[in-house]
Swiss-Prot record:
Physiological role: Cell wall formation.
Swiss-Prot/TrEMBL keywords: Cell cycle, Cell division, Cell shape, Cell wall biogenesis/degradation, Cytoplasm, FAD, Flavoprotein, NADP, Oxidoreductase, Peptidoglycan synthesis
EC top class, as a word: oxidoreductase
Active site, UniProt feature: 171, 223, 293
Cofactor(s) of this protein: FAD
Compartments, record wording: Cytoplasm
Matching PROSITE patterns: FAD_PCMH (PS51387)
GO molecular function terms noted in the UniProt entry: FAD binding; UDP-N-acetylmuramate dehydrogenase activity
Name under which the protein is recorded: UDP-N-acetylenolpyruvoylglucosamine reductase
Pfam name, any one: FAD_binding_4
Keyword Metal-binding among record annotations: no
HAMAP family attached to this UniProt entry: MurB (MF_00037)
Lineage top rank: taxon: Bacteria
């Protein structure tokens, strides 16, 4: 096939017909026709040119820590950025490629006495994913430290966006609105003062809290739902009596109801059914429609709940 030959000619690493469950933190998902691993921005651009010329479906992902992949897999190319992982620190600025693990960038910042990214040390996603969804925890968000980014548009033009250009809001950025691909981001941090809790201590404290409150022993995609205004998804789910509720081997965690965990070989459709049931139950009990925070890849039989389907 033209796409495959193009990758081989450019010496770009790829896998063929491999299950995506091996690449997601949920450990769920069928096969992708291709999984492609660009090592730098030039390779990423060449891959996108090839998928456009070949007319095949494509999707860019990072660490797949916030996604549910269909049991049917993905009939096209999954482009994963995890090998685009260079970052550098200049005084209180950190510039990181999209595939860097945000946890590693954050830990390095903390070790260097820089504060602002302590909340991200336990987040399992990439810089690209963190900026895309304005990731956050413990009353902090990526937008708080975001300085600027280089992005790629549909016509393969590279340009810079500043903080005000990104239209950040809760778990949202301009990257979700437009077909823009983040290539690298720069974060502006602050030097910790003598009277401050050392950043690495604060980061370690946050991680300890995560271990105590989150079901980290099971595969998951993190928080399944966005926080509804004035409330918490996990509390509403727990108050609806759904802790421990399961469909197949997908289960609402008994430790933290905001998580759905994979107890072993769970199917994506099990998770979708569980999401639907959770949305429906919470809406009928409290009148609140929970909106998924995770991304969906591929085709699903089970719909998401809508108020009109009540």
């Amino acid at each position: 096939m033209k796409f495959e030959r193009g990758l081989e000619k450019l010496n770009i690493e790829f896998l063929k017909d491999k299950p995506l469950k091996d690449f997601t933190t949920f450990k769920i998902g069928g096969k992708a026709r291709y999984i492609v691993f660009p090592k730098n921005i030039d390779e990423l651009i060449e891959i996108i040119k090839l998928v456009k010329e070949s007319g095949i479906n494509w999707r860019i992902v990072g660490n797949c820590s916030n996604v549910l992949v269909s049991d049917k897999g993905f009939d096209g190319a999954i482009i994963t950025t995890t090998k685009m992982d260079f970052f550098k620190t200049e005084e209180n600025l950190i510039e990181a490629e999209c595939g860097c693990m945000i946890s590693q960038v954050a830990r390095k910042a903390c070790e260097n006495g820089l504060k602002g990214l302590e909340f991200a040390v336990g987040i399992p996603g990439t810089v690209g994913g963190a900026v895309y969804m304005n990731a956050g925890a413990y009353d902090s968000e990526i937008k708080d430290v975001f300085e600027c980014a280089e992005v790629l548009d549909e016509d393969l033009n590279i340009f810079k966006l500043g903080k005000s250009d990104m239209r950040f809001s809760y778990r949202h950025s301009r990257l979700k609105e437009e077909k823009l691909i983040l290539l690298k981001a720069t974060f502006r941090l602050q030097y910790a003062r003598e009277e401050d809790v050392p950043p690495i201590e604060k980061a370690n404290e946050y991680n300890q809290r995560r271990r105590e409150k989150q079901p980290l022993q099971y595969p998951s995609a993190g928080s399944i739902f966005k926080r509804p205004p004035g409330n918490f998804a996990g509390k509403l789910i727990e108050d609806a009596g759904l802790k421990g509720y399961r469909v197949g081997n997908a289960c609402i965690s008994g430790k933290h109801a905001g998580f759905i965990v994979n107890l072993g070989d769970a199917l994506a459709e099990d998770v979708r059914k569980l999401i639907y049931h959770t949305q429906k139950s919470v809406y009928e009990k409290f009148g609140v429609l929970l909106e998924p925070e995770i991304e969906f890849i591929g085709e699903f039989e089970t719909p998401l709940f809508e108020m009109s389907t009540k």
